[in-house]
Amino acid sequence: TPANPVHVLQIHGTADETIAYAGADIQGTAYPGAVETVERWAAHNGCAVTGSETGTLDLDRGLAGRESTVTRYTRDCRAGGSAELWSIAEGGHVPELSDHFSKLVVEWLLGHPKP
């Protein structure tokens, strides 16, 4: 874990059978789910660990419509830190990325510079 706050974006399919969205274990070693992981980053960054759903995105062209929910953890964060989860509803481990996926990620990165 870094000493200073950091902006974190996690993108995870809810139907991921390789790394389960809800968490599970690999060969007897437990790992946290997507929400718990992002909440841990939010806590590290001093953010309130209650996220806010702020909209939807179309990240997976193999799924109909704007299937992905954006949850942001930005309240009360220390400078230079935040956490965000893009949950791809019914998305698997390797989504069929939409044509504008790269643009969305680059916009996110540029919008969250390290101070």
Task: Outline where the language-model segments fall.
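Hydrophobic positions within alpha-helical membrane elements
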Residues: 21, 95-98
